Amino acid sequence: MVRNINETFLKACKGERTDYVPAWYMRQAGRSQPEYRKIKEKYSLFEITHNPELCAYVTKLPVDQYNVDAAILYKDIMSPLPAIGVDVEIKSGIGPVIENPIRSMQDVEKLGEIHPEEDVPYILDTIRLLTAEMLDVPLIGFSGAPFTLASYMIEGGPSRNYHKTKAFMYAEPKAWFALMDKLSDMVIAYLKAQIQAGAKAVQVFDSWVGTVNVADYRIFIKPAMERIFAQVREMNVPMIMHGVGAGHLANEWNDLPLDVVGLDWRLSIEEARTRGIHKAVQGNMDPSLLLAPWNVIEEHVKGILDQGMKQPGYVFNLGHGVFPEVNPDTLKRLTAFIHEYSKEQLAK
């Protein structure tokens, strides 16, 4: 049975007019929710993602609590890496840690291929469960982008400056492009499998690409992104690109065969469009604002919505993930305000 879903989010991604501005929040399922924190007392992130019923519950929780217009699958960008031979551990207070970092072409050549139905069946089963039985809004699948995945694989974990990653990129270009090719193959297969399982849109997170300048992006990263989006495009679902601190790359993303350019708070929607961004836009509230008094939040959100609504194709989101300290009631109130205010303004 095919479930009827609210397609407002999908319409906005395609640049179509909507009755109100759709909203969802990165990390909407996570540490800000008391129910999630209780689950995390018993289970690790990977244990949750390996349990389709539990993972589906966590994914759906913010949809029920906040009335958002899309769900995003609960998992980590590192989830597919063990399938290609990368030993990943998520350490509390640190993040992903990789014991066997990439240091040479030989290390790159050891990486394998992903076969999603065999390697990550639990992720695909979670998608099938959510889309067949549980959700009344679209489910977003996602992947990390090759640069960000490579940065973890080379640094061995999170970094403040990504010196090792960029040094490898400059000093070992042959190995770098081989790594980009292997990761691109993985991302393409991984995203296609999520769509085949029922995801109605996909987002590619390039969390750390903001550390790279435009010239280097064009040489070392953009070809891989062009290949990913060109090949996933044949699946005919909206594709979203998002990075942090990457406003200087927005025009590069605008050139890619994708549907939605994700912005963080450093580049306003108005400025992005002035620069020639003609695709749908997603963003771009500073998540720190969620810790401010409501009257401050409301004033800022009005300003963001007023910019976003100037043309069709706008999805409200944060510029980064929800902080653990955020009160869930604030997110519920925020969604209601976005819906009410935008509906009123768009009806004029």
Curated annotation (Swiss-Prot):
It is found in: Cytoplasm. Belongs to the uroporphyrinogen decarboxylase family. The keyword Cytoplasm applies. One of its GO terms (cellular component) is cytosol. HAMAP family: URO_D (MF_00218). This is Uroporphyrinogen decarboxylase. One of its GO terms (biological process) is protoporphyrinogen IX biosynthetic process.
